[in-house]
C-alpha cells in the first residue's frame, strides 16, 4: 500500500475447497472481531460469490464478472474463474486503490474455492505476494470439511491437498477442520480427534485402509503418499465450529501469532501477554480433548484396542 508513513496492515486469506465454509467463516470471524473492537473489512475475491451474507468492503465483481467472462469467452465455470483471477492479477492497481482507503482495518479475504488456484496455478499466489509488498501481513486460513476425517482415504487426500497448498501459497498458514459440530454425521471416527488434528502416526490409517478390498490394491501408493506427508511434517489442524466463540478464539490466537498481529502496536499489550502468545497454546491437548467430548460420541473401547482389531 502506498505511503511510507502508513502502518502495517494485517489480515487473513481464507482459502479451501468449495463447500468448506469459507464465506460462513468470514461472516462469523468478522462479527467476532468487531465484538473485540477491531475494525474489519471483508474483501470478496471470488467472482462466483453471489448473495454475500456479510457487508462487503471490496468486491472483485466490480472489476470482472464470472458470467460475463463465460459468455464472452465461451469458458466453463472453472476456466472462467481462472481467467477472472488472472485478470485481477493483471489489474492489481484497481485492488490497491480499493484497499488503500481501508488502511487501519483488519482484512478478511474471501477467496475462490477452486483447488488448483492454491495448489499449482500462479495467479492467487502472485496476488498474495504483491499484497505483502504493500505491507499487508496475511495468514492463509485453509478450511477443509471435518467429515473427511471419517474416511481414511479422503483424509489422506486432504492431507496431500493441505501440504501442496502450504508449499504453493507461501504464506504463514493455519489449517482448520471446519463444521466440527457435524463431524460424525457421515460416520464414526476410527481414532481420537487429536490423531487427526496433530496428524499422528499415519501407518494406522494404512492398516485401516487395508481392511477395504478396493484400497488394498493401492497400498503402495498410499504408503508413498503417507511417507511424503510425514517427511515434510508440516500439516496439522485446528478444529473449528464457527458457532462456538471459544473455538473462534482459538483460531484467532493461532492466526494472530502466525501473521504477527499479537505483537503489533494497534492494541496495548503487556510483555506477559506477548510472551504468552509467543510460547503458549502449542500443546493444546486439553482443548482438543474438550472438543472431542463435546462433538464426538463416546467410544465403547479405547483407541488402542480398536486399532488392534483392524
Curated annotation (Swiss-Prot):
In-chain residues carrying the UniProt-annotated modification N-acetylalanine: 2
Binding site for GTP: 19-24, 178-181
Source domain of life: Eukaryota
Keyword vocabulary terms for this entry: Acetylation, GTP-binding, Hydrolase, Nucleotide-binding
The UniProt record lists the keyword Ribosomal protein: no
Gene3D superfamilies: P-loop containing nucleotide triphosphate hydrolases
Alphabetical list of SUPFAM superfamilies matching this protein: P-loop containing nucleoside triphosphate hydrolases
Annotated site, Stabilizes the phosphate intermediate, chain positions: 78
CDD domains: GPN2
Gene Ontology MF terms in the entry: GTP binding; GTPase activity
Span(s) of short sequence motif Gly-Pro-Asn (GPN)-loop: 76-78
Family: Belongs to the GPN-loop GTPase family.
Subunit structure: Heterodimers with GPN1 or GPN3. Binds to RNA polymerase II (RNAPII).
Function: Small GTPase required for proper localization of RNA polymerase II and III (RNAPII and RNAPIII). May act at an RNAP assembly step prior to nuclear import.
Protein name per its UniProtKB record: GPN-loop GTPase 2
Species name: Sus scrofa (Pig)
Name of the gene encoding the protein in the UniProt record: GPN2
